[in-house]
């Protein structure tokens, strides 16, 4: 049974649900986590997560299938990415089994908020790992909190699967060379807020960031990854140590090759070579796929497939991926975890 909400017009915003998961790391080990109705985190005013940004987060979704069951999409990959981020920030890893079991517990406890099949809406999960305790000085915490909360969401970008325009930004960088760009840390997103506002004020959906070293290559699209489709049936995505490795992107790389017969390519995407792409888009957990109609760079505006219509290959990839996520298309082995 589900609650009564306007599922098809949810948007992407916070909603307080009855239950979330909470676990503490103390004395060198994780304590047993539990579900709680308390949506407030209790931590010291001197916690390193507040002062020095020792925090990491993830994002994944639960999907209602046609038969009414609920499933998660590749949660083990989110666990592994959080572990890599934790290593980068000197935080304890959350074991994969603990992570996946906690996700399943949160979904099960809030199952009435998993949107009905056919609405296009999903239950978004936000795992969060933060350093807490009485610490002053730039050093790792002794204690940590791992928590997961959930909320039903619609489309991240207004309008869903429709082309929108993006602003190529070469005055601001998302991450520094050899910095934390490949980790999912809050500081990367804080740095993107100001250039993001510039783009939104100019009626662009988001920012496309260039490589911080030369400003000649595309890296990320705001909070998503960039991809391009060539006339030679290639699926191309940027490759850089300062790009967050997107689970959605790597899923699309696999599907492009094994389901659509395309050639997957990870490599440099130069801004002076955009004519090679007949279609382009942004992809990520929140956005899924957002077709890019055109991009503004300085005084130049470049259109890919169309500013009003979704390209045929982008549509096929979207249908294949969402079909797997909602249980309508057979998934590659290990991609789907059922919530019992």
Q: Where are these predicted regions, by residue range?
A:
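Charged, gly/pro-rich active-site loop segments
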Residues: 96-97, 106-120
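Helix-start/capping segments and mature chain N-termini
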Residues: 1-102, 106, 128, 135-340
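Extended, Lys/Arg-enriched charged tracts that mediate electrostatic binding to polyanionic substrates
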Residues: 116-130
């Amino acid at each position: 049974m589900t609650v009564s909400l306007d599922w098809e017009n949810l948007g992407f915003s916070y909603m307080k649900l009855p239950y979330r998961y909470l676990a503490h790391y103390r004395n060198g080990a994780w304590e047993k986590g539990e579900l709680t109705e308390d949506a407030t985190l209790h931590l010291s005013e001197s916690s390193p997560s507040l002062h020095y940004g020792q925090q990491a987060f993830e994002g994944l979704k639960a999907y209602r299938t046609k038969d009414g069951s609920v499933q998660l999409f590749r949660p083990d990959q989110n666990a592994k990415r959080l572990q890599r981020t934790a290593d980068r920030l000197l935080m304890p890893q959350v074991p994969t089994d603990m992570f996946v079991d906690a996700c399943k517990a949160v979904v099960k406890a809030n199952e009435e908020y998993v949107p009905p099949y056919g609405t296009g809406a999903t239950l978004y999960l936000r795992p969060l790992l933060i350093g807490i305790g009485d610490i002053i000085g730039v050093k790792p915490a002794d204690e940590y909190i791992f928590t997961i909360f959930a909320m039903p969401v619609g489309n991240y970008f207004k309008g869903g699967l429709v082309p929108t325009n993006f602003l190529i930004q070469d005055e601001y960088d998302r991450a520094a060379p050899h910095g934390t760009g490949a980790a999912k840390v809050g500081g990367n997103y804080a740095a993107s807020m100001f250039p993001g506002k510039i783009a939104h004020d100019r009626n662009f959906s988001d920012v496309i960031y260039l490589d911080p070293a030369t400003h000649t290559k595309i890296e990320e699209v705001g909070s998503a990854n960039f991809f391009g489709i060539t006339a030679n049936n290639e699926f191309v995505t940027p490759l850089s140590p300062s790009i967050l490795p997107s689970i959605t992107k790597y899923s699309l790389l696999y599907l492009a090759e094994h389901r659509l017969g395309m050639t997957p390519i990870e490599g440099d995407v130069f801004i002076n070579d955009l004519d090679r792409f007949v279609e382009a888009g942004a992809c990520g957990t929140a956005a899924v796929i957002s077709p890019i109609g055109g991009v503004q760079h300085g005084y130049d505006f470049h259109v890919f497939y169309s500013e009003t219509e979704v390209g045929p290959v982008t549509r096929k990839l979207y249908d294949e991926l969402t079909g797997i996520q909602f249980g309508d298309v057979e998934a590659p082995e290990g991609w789907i975890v059922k919530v019992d």
